[in-house]
Amino acid sequence: AGEEIVLVKWIGMEGTLRIIREEGAALAERFAPGFLNKLEDMRDEIFSDRAMEIAGRNGVSAMHPIGEGGILAALWDMAEGAGIGLSVEMKKMTVRQETIEVCEVFHLNPYQLTSTGAVLMVTPKGEELKERLKREGIPAEIIGHTTEGNERIIWGGGEKRFLDRPAPDELARIYEMKENVNA
């Protein structure tokens, strides 16, 4: 306990790209073509073997990929698996504005959106790791720290709340909406 939690890459990118691929026509009515093309161009930025190499050489005690269910599910799974608590700040979680805007169209929560390629890293040297990753052009931010016990606290807008057991990935809601429209 007491180690820093570093978020590497952006949350929700994989989900955003899948939404663009599957709902491109609906998004084309709301956004300029350049906006959607810019997002498609980011596909190559999702994965970073370099981040894993840097982590391996910089005292990372645990790594947890962020996949289905987004960062909230990953934080829960990581804490549950390690038997630890955590305290994290929502505003420090790196999410691209494009992801927020695409999520707003479909009323989705970007924090519960699949985030393949993003990783949580736990280390006693969070600032060092963050700076090394950033020097390599890899987005990284210290979002919180591990704690004794098993309280999982999320701070947002000055309010303290407890992390809930993971909900289904937000992409499932898009599929449900489509089924309801086609029913």
Which residues does each PLM region occupy?
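Phosphate/diphosphate-binding glycine-rich loops and adjacent basic-rich segments that engage nucleotide
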Residues: 1-41
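Short beta-strand segments
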Residues: 6-10, 114, 122, 144
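Helix N-cap motif at beta-to-alpha junctions
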Residues: 122-128
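Acidic, Ser/Thr/Pro-rich beta/coil linker or hinge segments at domain junctions
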Residues: 136-183
